Amino acid sequence: MSTEGDHVPQAEEVIETVEVVEEETGSSPLSVEDSLKEVLKRALVHDGLARGIREASKALDRRQAHLCVLCESCDQEAYVKLVEALCAESQTPLVKVADPKILGEWAGLCVLDRDGNARKVVGCSCVAVTDYGEDSVALQTLLSSFAA
């Protein structure tokens, strides 16, 4: 019985330490671009990305998408209008990214070398997030930027 009583204060001390660490990481805010990159990586791990205009438009039409990322330099104006209209209809937040290669890298459409650098990146015009995966500081930062 006395050993169980000793474990309870130690567990409380560990919880207090974790809370202090969370407060320290919360003090350095992530930029919207960094948080978007982190959210897309977590969604990719949890199989929650619809990559490409076809998959993304289907997810938006079914109202399964929680977030949509569109490339600004898309050469097909009809694609841009379609995605913007579907996002407006379902009130899905829309983020625009300048370069399709960056979006393709964030969506996992690349090959990583031994050092973890992206090679052979395929450009991507549109990505829809259907499952965020686990909750994170980056997700909260991104969602709060849409609320503002």
Swiss-Prot record:
GO terms for molecular function: structural constituent of ribosome. Its main location: cytoplasm. It comes from the Eukaryota. The lineage of its organism: Eukaryota, Fungi, Dikarya, Ascomycota, Taphrinomycotina. There are 2 genes for eS12 in S.pombe. Component of the small ribosomal subunit (SSU). Mature yeast ribosomes consist of a small (40S) and a large (60S) subunit. The 40S small subunit contains 1 molecule of ribosomal RNA (18S rRNA) and at least 33 different proteins. The large 60S subunit contains 3 rRNA molecules (25S, 5.8S and 5S rRNA) and at least 46 different proteins. This is Small ribosomal subunit protein eS12B. The gene is rps1202. One of its GO terms (biological process) is maintenance of translational fidelity. Keywords: Cytoplasm, Ribonucleoprotein, Ribosomal protein. It comes from Schizosaccharomyces pombe (strain 972 / ATCC 24843).
